[in-house]
A protein has these predicted regions:
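ATP-binding/phosphotransfer module of carbohydrate and carboxylate kinases, centering on a glycine-rich
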Residues: 1-61, 72-74, 97-100, 118-124, ...
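Phosphate-binding/catalytic loop of phosphoryl-transfer enzymes
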Residues: 9, 21, 61-63, 69-172, ...
Length: 298
């Protein structure tokens, strides 16, 4: 059976795994990602060099999941998120020449969708989507049984969606800031007066699960906003199912509140007075959480 080296490049760490062709993880670890504010592309490639050298004689190829708008055919990065030093580079081609083996590159949100479509919560669907609640809101879209990338590789870049038409010049008006995990932290901090950076998913849901009424109220505000965008996404694409991913999606309380918020949206739609039918999105959790990008990249 053939083995591959798969990277999931994030802003803080780059995870990697030795995987077989059935996406079974044989070994897994991570290395720090060089800071884009002080480091260069060559610094990042040097980090990859160290990992590749470790597995060079055991792999048939390399697959990479990374942020940004990119062309999966050659790995050209229009943007690269927190790996800004890779923007404008044809990463797939460059690394293939560097290591002498095939290298594929795909957007991280699209990798999550591919993983769920291959072996997870979207398996067997014709039209579906993944919404990943991370630092921002990422994801991917499956249409007619295939990953939909769009003409400019931006399909599924939900963070760019404007959610407040009255304030399009403010960052808080975009889905990426107000509905990612950081968005939830910002909502809570706004009402407590604390620095939002003191809140992470574990702290927020620790308080929520302990019955903190203030945190529960802010969680409801967060899921109300998220539910509206999920409703809109389903209206645009008429999907079989929408899978919610990201670290905080592992919290049962989030799914409970999100489903409740979505039910309220559907119950209160005034269009029911005109038409008895209103499209109702079906949501579920992603099957693969932290490993989704690794599996989808393969």
């Amino acid at each position: 059976m053939k083995n591959y080296l798969v990277f999931d490049a994030g802003g803080t760490f780059t995870k990697y795994a030795l995987m077989d062709e059935n996406a079974e993880i044989l070994e897994k670890d991570k290395v720090p990602t060089p800071d884009y504010r002080t480091k260069t592309k060559e610094d990042y490639y040097a980090v990859l060099d160290g990992v590749v050298e470790k597995y060079r004689n055991r792999i048939e190829g390399i697959a990479i999941s990374m942020p940004g708008m990119l062309d999966n055919k050659d790995g050209y990065c229009v943007t690269a998120g927190y790996l800004a030093y890779l923007a404008g580079s044809t990463v797939g081609t460059e690394l293939s020449k560097r290591y002498g083996i095939p290298v594929s590159v795909e957007n991280d949100g699209k990798c999550a969708a591919l993983a769920e479509f291959w072996r997870g919560s979207l398996k067997g669907c014709t039209n579906g989507a993944v919404v990943v609640l991370g630092s921002g809101v990422a994801g991917g879209i499956i249409l007619n049984g295939k990953l939909f990338r769009g003409n400019h590789f931006t399909a599924g870049e939900y963070s760019y969606v404007c959610t407040d038409a009255k304030k399009p010049a403010e960052m808080e008006s975009y889905w990426g800031l107000n509905s990612g995990a950081e968005g939830l932290a910002r909502i809570i901090a706004k009402h407590t007066g604390e620095n939002w950076q003191t809140y992470d998913g574990l702290k927020i849901f620790g308080l929520a699960n302990d019955g903190d009424e203030k945190v529960l109220a802010e969680l409801k505000e967060y899921t109300d906003s998220l539910a509206v965008q999920i409703y809109n996404l389903n209206i645009y694409l008429d999907l079989d199912i929408i899978a919610i991913g990201g670290g905080i999606s592992q919290q049962p309380l989030l799914h409970k509140y999100l489903q409740r918020s979505l039910d309220e949206v559907l119950e209160n739609i005034p269009l029911r007075k005109i038409s008895p039918y209103v499209p109702e999105p079906k949501i579920t959790n992603c099957r693969f959480y932290n490993d989704a990008n690794l599996i989808g990249a393969l």
